[in-house]
């Protein structure tokens, strides 16, 4: 991370208290049971399982009430702040239950009318959304990015609750994720919005996610773009006025909205671009007064973002390509899914990277396949998370082409797919 990016850890408080264990309870869509009744029965379940080892999910229950009303009970995010899974004694922890039901409907469009055109200015989700279920867990990062982002938003709510004078201590509720394309910045923003809606379900009845289509807000008559930005944020203000809702505003590729003033002065951008920058900054200053809004932004080209916008971001987090250790976790989750679906058959146990470390990476019948996966992970360094998630599909399509395959055969195909990916890159760079 470059020097211009503040240390995320320094921006967040360290609280020395009894650990809190978060338990997410996915209530069935058709269930009409009261949340308090669901929580009561889940606590009975947890009382029978005082000791758990890291994250854990129940999907089958002995209790008929849970079978009828609950899809799953998950102990989550225990590994965000510790490197290795640890036994957890629930009787010594504060257990926070978060009961939620997923909204099955997809996104709706927010339109702005401009003369004869109807501009799709944003996509709008009601959270928690079925579309984003499981997205948080699928994102793998080396640093404590996910836990720090969660802590940041919780801190903004704490400061608002305690009526901290924002003239003395400022926070703008703006997060900027920047880094190369394909590293999962936009997905992380959506997953964070979903996670926080669930985490804060006792405080807010639902969440709203507005993904602004930055490019569509640039009118073909450039001078009108500032007005479009203002109208877009007025629509968002209507959502913020509902205090039962936690509102997330996602601006993807924010550099397209905040074209640097320097470029305007140099004559490489139209002078009307300054009006767009000013409109965005003014609207952010307007909505930051509200405690139920968080602005999430991403950028692939940090250098093009207006300095005044960067200064408004409380957290500027670099999101880079995954390391070999993170790649191993990504591949492992892909293999588990393919074994669950019986595309890889028969199922075989794979060791985690931590378990390989504990045996000193010694090769034997138990560790052989996991060591091969570790080797494939190392040679995959440099590939983005987006590409890595696609490689198992490409491996099957290009080198297997059969309904089922052994894990040995699949790992060989995956290795070939990685080699081909780098070869294709080399050819493209030569064009």
Curated annotation (Swiss-Prot):
Gene Ontology CC terms, in alphabetical order = chromosome; nucleus
Would I find Cytoplasm among this entry's keywords?
no
Origin superkingdom: Eukaryota
Q: Name one GO molecular function term.
A: ATP binding
Q: Which residues carry this modification: N-acetylmethionine?
A: 1
InterPro entries, sorted: AAA+_ATPase, ATPase_AAA_core, ATPase_AAA_CS, ClpA/B, P-loop_NTPase, Pch2-like
Q: Is ATP-binding among the key words of this record?
A: yes
Pfam families from the xrefs? AAA, AAA_lid_TRIP13_C, TRIP13_N
UniProt xrefs under Gene3D superfamilies:
P-loop containing nucleotide triphosphate hydrolases (3.40.50.300)
Which keywords, in A-to-Z order, does the entry hold? Answer: Acetylation, ATP-binding, Differentiation, Meiosis, Nucleotide-binding, Oogenesis, Spermatogenesis
In the record, biological process GO terms are:
double-strand break repair; meiotic recombination checkpoint signaling; mitotic spindle assembly checkpoint signaling; oogenesis; reciprocal meiotic recombination; spermatogenesis; synaptonemal complex assembly
Chain residues that bind ATP: 179-186
Q: Could you say which protein family the record assigns here?
A: Belongs to the AAA ATPase family. PCH2 subfamily.
Function recorded in the entry = Plays a key role in chromosome recombination and chromosome structure development during meiosis. Required at early steps in meiotic recombination that leads to non-crossovers pathways. Also needed for efficient completion of homologous synapsis by influencing crossover distribution along the chromosomes affecting both crossovers and non-crossovers pathways. Also required for development of higher-order chromosome structures and is needed for synaptonemal-complex formation. In males, required for efficient synapsis of the sex chromosomes and for sex body formation.
Q: How does it assemble?
A: Specifically interacts with the ligand binding domain of the thyroid receptor (TR). This interaction does not require the presence of thyroid hormone for its interaction. Interacts with proteasome subunit PSMA8; to participate in meiosis progression during spermatogenesis.
- The name under which this protein is listed is Pachytene checkpoint protein 2 homolog
| Organism whose genome encodes this protein | Sus scrofa (Pig)
Which gene holds the coding sequence for this protein? TRIP13
């Amino acid at each position: 991370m470059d020097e211009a990016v503040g240390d995320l850890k320094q921006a967040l408080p360290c609280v020395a208290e009894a650990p809190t264990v978060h338990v997410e309870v996915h209530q069935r869509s058709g269930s009409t049971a009261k949340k308090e009744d669901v929580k009561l029965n889940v606590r009975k379940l947890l009382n029978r399982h005082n000791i758990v080892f890291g994250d854990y999910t129940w999907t089958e229950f002995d209790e008929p009430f849970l079978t009828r009303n609950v899809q799953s009970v998950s102990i989550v995010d225990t590994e965000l702040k510790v490197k290795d899974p640890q036994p957890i004694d629930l009787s010594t922890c504060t257990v926070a239950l978060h009961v939620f039901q997923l909204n099955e409907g997809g996104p709706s469009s927010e339109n702005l009318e401009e003369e004869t055109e109807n501009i799709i200015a944003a996509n709008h989700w009601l959270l928690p959304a079925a579309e984003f279920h499981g997205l948080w867990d699928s994102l793998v990062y080396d640093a404590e990015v996910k836990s720090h982002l969660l802590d940041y938003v919780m801190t903004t709510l704490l400061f608002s609750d305690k009526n901290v004078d924002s003239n003395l201590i400022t926070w703008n509720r703006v997060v900027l994720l920047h880094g190369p394309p394909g590293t999962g910045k936009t997905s992380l923003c959506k997953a964070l919005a979903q996670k926080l809606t669930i985490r804060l379900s006792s405080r807010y009845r639902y969440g709203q996610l507005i993904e602004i289509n930055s490019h569509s807000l640039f009118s073909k008559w450039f001078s009108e773009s500032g007005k479009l930005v203002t109208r877009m944020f007025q629509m968002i203000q209507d959502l913020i006025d509902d205090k039962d809702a936690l509102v997330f505003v996602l601006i993807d590729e924010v550099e397209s909205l905040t074209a640097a003033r320097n470029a305007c002065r140099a004559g490489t951008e139209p002078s009307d671009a300054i009006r767009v920058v000013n409109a965005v900054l003014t609207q952010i200053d307007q909505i930051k007064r509200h405690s139920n809004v968080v602005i999430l932004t991403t950028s692939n080209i940090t250098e093009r973002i207006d300095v005044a916008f960067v200064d408004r971001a409380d957290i500027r987090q670099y999101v880079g390509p995954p390391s070999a250790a993170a790649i191993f976790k990504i591949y492992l989750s892909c293999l588990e899914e393919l074994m669950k679906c019986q595309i890889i058959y028969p199922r075989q146990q794979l060791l985690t990277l931590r378990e390989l470390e504990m045996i000193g990476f010694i090769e034997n019948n138990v560790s052989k396949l996991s060591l091969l996966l570790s080797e494939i992970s190392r040679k995959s360094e440099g590939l983005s998370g987006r590409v890595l998630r696609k490689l198992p599909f490409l491996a099957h399509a290009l080198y297997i082409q059969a309904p089922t395959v052994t894990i040995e055969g699949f790992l060989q195909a995956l290795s070939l797919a990685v080699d081909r990916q780098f070869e294709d890159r080399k050819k493209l760079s030569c064009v």
